[in-house]
Amino acid sequence: MNLAKFPRRGYVTEPTPLEALPNFSKALGADINIYIKRDDLLPGTAGGNKTRKLDFSMADAINQGADTIITCGVQSNHCRLTLAWAVKEGLDCHLVLEERVKDSYNPEASGNNFLFQLLGVKSVTVVPGGSNMLGEMEKLAEKLRAEGK
Protein backbone atom coordinates (compact mmCIF):
# COMPACT_ATOMS: atom_id res chain seq x y z
CA MET A 1 0.00 0.00 0.00
CA ASN A 2 1.30 3.41 -0.93
CA LEU A 3 0.87 5.55 2.20
CA ALA A 4 2.07 8.64 0.34
CA LYS A 5 -1.39 9.07 -1.17
CA PHE A 6 -2.94 9.71 2.26
CA PRO A 7 -2.76 13.18 3.86
CA ARG A 8 -0.51 13.55 6.89
CA ARG A 9 0.19 16.27 9.44
CA GLY A 10 3.96 15.84 9.43
CA TYR A 11 4.39 14.63 13.01
CA VAL A 12 6.89 12.02 11.84
CA THR A 13 9.65 13.66 9.82
CA GLU A 14 12.66 11.45 10.52
CA PRO A 15 13.11 7.70 10.83
CA THR A 16 13.62 6.49 14.38
CA PRO A 17 16.77 4.51 15.14
CA LEU A 18 17.18 0.80 15.65
CA GLU A 19 19.00 -0.06 18.85
CA ALA A 20 20.83 -3.34 19.37
CA LEU A 21 19.86 -5.42 22.40
CA PRO A 22 23.00 -7.56 22.88
CA ASN A 23 22.04 -8.90 26.32
CA PHE A 24 18.64 -10.02 25.05
CA SER A 25 20.24 -11.57 21.97
CA LYS A 26 22.72 -13.41 24.19
CA ALA A 27 19.96 -14.62 26.55
CA LEU A 28 18.19 -16.27 23.63
CA GLY A 29 21.29 -18.36 23.10
CA ALA A 30 21.03 -18.47 19.35
CA ASP A 31 23.30 -16.78 16.86
CA ILE A 32 20.88 -13.91 16.30
CA ASN A 33 20.85 -10.18 16.86
CA ILE A 34 17.76 -8.54 18.35
CA TYR A 35 17.03 -4.86 17.74
CA ILE A 36 14.31 -2.54 18.95
CA LYS A 37 12.82 0.30 16.91
CA ARG A 38 12.95 3.42 19.10
CA ASP A 39 9.55 4.93 18.29
CA ASP A 40 9.53 6.22 21.86
CA LEU A 41 11.76 8.99 20.47
CA LEU A 42 9.01 10.32 18.19
CA PRO A 43 7.65 13.78 19.03
CA GLY A 44 4.57 14.13 21.22
CA THR A 45 4.08 13.01 24.78
CA ALA A 46 6.06 9.76 24.78
CA GLY A 47 3.52 7.75 22.87
CA GLY A 48 5.71 5.63 20.64
CA ASN A 49 4.20 4.31 17.44
CA LYS A 50 0.80 5.91 18.18
CA THR A 51 2.23 9.12 16.72
CA ARG A 52 2.45 7.34 13.35
CA LYS A 53 -1.29 6.57 13.19
CA LEU A 54 -2.22 10.00 14.55
CA ASP A 55 -0.19 11.63 11.77
CA PHE A 56 -2.85 10.26 9.40
CA SER A 57 -6.00 10.31 11.54
CA MET A 58 -5.54 13.92 12.67
CA ALA A 59 -4.98 14.97 9.05
CA ASP A 60 -8.24 13.25 8.14
CA ALA A 61 -10.13 14.98 10.96
CA ILE A 62 -8.73 18.40 10.08
CA ASN A 63 -9.44 17.91 6.37
CA GLN A 64 -13.06 17.13 7.31
CA GLY A 65 -13.27 20.42 9.22
CA ALA A 66 -13.38 18.92 12.71
CA ASP A 67 -13.07 21.27 15.66
CA THR A 68 -13.34 18.51 18.27
CA ILE A 69 -11.75 15.10 18.73
CA ILE A 70 -13.33 12.32 20.79
CA THR A 71 -11.36 9.17 21.50
CA CYS A 72 -11.42 6.29 23.96
CA GLY A 73 -9.19 3.90 25.82
CA VAL A 74 -8.29 2.42 29.20
CA GLN A 75 -5.93 4.64 31.28
CA SER A 76 -4.75 5.30 27.86
CA ASN A 77 -1.45 6.39 26.37
CA HIS A 78 -3.37 6.59 23.09
CA CYS A 79 -5.77 9.08 24.69
CA ARG A 80 -2.89 11.11 26.11
CA LEU A 81 -1.15 11.34 22.76
CA THR A 82 -4.37 12.11 20.87
CA LEU A 83 -5.05 14.91 23.35
CA ALA A 84 -1.53 16.31 22.95
CA TRP A 85 -1.79 16.45 19.16
CA ALA A 86 -5.35 17.84 19.31
CA VAL A 87 -4.16 20.67 21.56
CA LYS A 88 -1.23 21.35 19.23
CA GLU A 89 -3.70 21.53 16.32
CA GLY A 90 -6.06 23.86 18.21
CA LEU A 91 -8.82 21.25 18.53
CA ASP A 92 -10.93 20.45 21.58
CA CYS A 93 -10.48 16.91 22.86
CA HIS A 94 -12.82 14.75 24.94
CA LEU A 95 -11.86 11.34 26.31
CA VAL A 96 -13.97 8.30 27.16
CA LEU A 97 -12.15 5.89 29.47
CA GLU A 98 -13.21 2.31 30.14
CA GLU A 99 -12.92 1.24 33.78
CA ARG A 100 -12.31 -2.48 33.30
CA VAL A 101 -11.98 -3.17 37.04
CA LYS A 102 -15.00 -1.80 38.94
CA ASP A 103 -14.19 1.17 41.21
CA SER A 104 -10.54 1.15 40.15
CA TYR A 105 -10.39 4.53 38.42
CA ASN A 106 -8.77 7.10 40.68
CA PRO A 107 -7.92 10.33 38.87
CA GLU A 108 -5.54 11.42 41.64
CA ALA A 109 -3.50 8.23 41.25
CA SER A 110 -3.15 8.33 37.47
CA GLY A 111 -0.15 9.81 35.72
CA ASN A 112 -2.11 9.95 32.49
CA ASN A 113 -5.00 11.75 34.20
CA PHE A 114 -2.54 14.34 35.53
CA LEU A 115 -1.29 14.86 31.97
CA PHE A 116 -4.88 14.98 30.63
CA GLN A 117 -5.55 17.92 32.97
CA LEU A 118 -2.20 19.57 32.28
CA LEU A 119 -2.79 19.38 28.53
CA GLY A 120 -6.30 20.86 28.83
CA VAL A 121 -8.69 17.99 28.17
CA LYS A 122 -12.25 19.28 27.73
CA SER A 123 -13.85 16.27 29.47
CA VAL A 124 -13.05 12.80 30.74
CA THR A 125 -15.97 10.38 30.86
CA VAL A 126 -15.39 7.09 32.70
CA VAL A 127 -17.66 4.19 31.73
CA PRO A 128 -17.90 0.65 33.14
CA GLY A 129 -15.82 -2.15 31.66
CA GLY A 130 -17.51 -3.91 28.77
CA SER A 131 -19.31 -0.76 27.64
CA ASN A 132 -19.91 -0.17 23.95
CA MET A 133 -17.11 2.37 23.54
CA LEU A 134 -18.17 3.45 20.05
CA GLY A 135 -21.69 3.98 21.39
CA GLU A 136 -20.38 5.96 24.36
CA MET A 137 -18.34 8.21 22.07
CA GLU A 138 -21.37 8.72 19.81
CA LYS A 139 -23.52 9.72 22.82
CA LEU A 140 -20.90 12.30 23.74
CA ALA A 141 -20.72 13.51 20.12
CA GLU A 142 -24.52 13.97 20.04
CA LYS A 143 -24.38 15.96 23.29
CA LEU A 144 -21.61 18.17 21.90
CA ARG A 145 -23.48 18.68 18.61
CA ALA A 146 -26.56 19.75 20.59
CA GLU A 147 -24.31 22.32 22.30
CA GLY A 148 -23.21 23.66 18.90
CA LYS A 149 -19.92 21.80 18.45
Question: Model segments located where?
Answer:
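PLP-dependent amino-acid enzyme catalytic core
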Residues: 1-149
